[in-house]
């Protein structure tokens, strides 16, 4: 399974540098000089590999320069490109209370009383912590903080996440 670790938001400057939105919990390991990333263009087309020439932090994004991307036109052509890794290449997690995002996405979320909330559509990484974006049966989104006080258990085998939501968390009105 391919996992997205970053996406080109836009060109930065005139020398081929790109603004990349990070979508990995290990940007220091994935976005380093000399690393090779597999890129998929947004409008189809063939995937290709990109070698990182330089990288630096810019707010909550990275400014990345790739070998062979030497000007703004070349950088603009990459807008929307996503960078991928194969989930089979990820190291196993030793801690039973830690998960890769893709392991949580698609799991059914239920309350301690057994009521179904919905399915995890996405895991959001924010400055305040992780949030589970849960898509309900009526196609609304509920954000559930991924903290032990609310998320009581995660069963990958049963494909279930059990939560004990505080009053008001699931109120959608």
From Swiss-Prot:
Pfam families in the record: PRC_RimM, RimM
Domain of life: Bacteria
A single BP term in Gene Ontology: ribosomal small subunit biogenesis
GO cellular component: cytoplasm; ribosome
Protein family membership: Belongs to the RimM family.
Subunit structure: Binds ribosomal protein uS19.
Annotated function: An accessory protein needed during the final step in the assembly of 30S ribosomal subunit, possibly for assembly of the head region. Essential for efficient processing of 16S rRNA. May be needed both before and after RbfA during the maturation of 16S rRNA. It has affinity for free ribosomal 30S subunits but not for 70S ribosomes.
UniProt free text on domains: The PRC barrel domain binds ribosomal protein uS19.
HAMAP family hit by this protein: Ribosome_mat_RimM
Stated name of the protein: Ribosome maturation factor RimM
């Amino acid at each position: 399974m391919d996992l997205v670790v970053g996406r080109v938001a836009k060109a930065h400057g005139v020398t081929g540098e790109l603004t990349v939105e990070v979508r990995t919990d290990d940007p220091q390991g994935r976005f380093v000089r000399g690393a090779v990333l597999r890129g998929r263009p947004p409008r189809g087309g063939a995937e290709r590999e990109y070698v990182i020439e330089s990288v630096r932090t810019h707010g909550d994004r990275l400014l990345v320069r790739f070998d062979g991307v030497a000007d703004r036109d070349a950088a603009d052509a990459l807008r929307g490109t996503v960078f991928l890794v194969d989930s089979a290449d990820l190291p196993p997690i030793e801690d039973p209370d830690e998960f890769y995002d893709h392991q949580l996405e698609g799991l059914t979320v239920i309350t301690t009383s057994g009521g179904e909330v919905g399915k995890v559509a996405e895991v959001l990484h924010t400055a305040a912590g992780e949030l589970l974006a849960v898509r309900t049966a009526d196609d609304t989104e509920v954000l559930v903080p991924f903290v032990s006080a609310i998320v009581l258990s995660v069963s990958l085998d049963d494909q279930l996440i059990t939560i004990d939501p505080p009053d008001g968390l699931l109120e959608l009105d």
